[in-house]
């Protein structure tokens, strides 16, 4: 018997994977979205969180970008 689960395959570098795993761990148990951690750079997540992950990564990158100070 085969069990099929609909989800989204996420491929990213190791720091982004850790960021997504940390997001998942900070959620209450009923809202956890990672179905399976495939390896250090690939995750299988529930399809309804794709946009939330994209937004969180975008915000994270904006916060970590360097802006040259104006003198």
Swiss-Prot record:
It holds the Pfam family Tfb5. GO terms for biological process: nucleotide-excision repair; transcription initiation at RNA polymerase II promoter. InterPro entries: TFB5-like_sf, TFIIH_TTDA/Tfb5. It comes from the Eukaryota. One of its GO terms (cellular component) is transcription factor TFIIH core complex. Keywords: DNA damage, DNA repair, Nucleus, Transcription, Transcription regulation. It is found in: Nucleus. Component of the general transcription and DNA repair factor IIH (TFIIH) core complex, which is involved in general and transcription-coupled nucleotide excision repair (NER) of damaged DNA and, when complexed to CAK, in RNA transcription by RNA polymerase II. In NER, TFIIH acts by opening DNA around the lesion to allow the excision of the damaged oligonucleotide and its replacement by a new DNA fragment. In transcription, TFIIH has an essential role in transcription initiation. PANTHER family: GENERAL TRANSCRIPTION FACTOR IIH SUBUNIT 5. Component of the 7-subunit TFIIH core complex composed of XPB, XPD, TFB1/GTF2H1, GTF2H2/P44, TFB4/GTF2H3, TFB2/GTF2H4 and TFB5/GTF2H5, which is active in NER. The core complex associates with the 3-subunit CDK-activating kinase (CAK) module composed of CYCH1/cyclin H1, CDKD and MAT1/At4g30820 to form the 10-subunit holoenzyme (holo-TFIIH) active in transcription. Belongs to the TFB5 family. This is General transcription and DNA repair factor IIH subunit TFB5. It comes from Arabidopsis thaliana. The gene is TFB5.
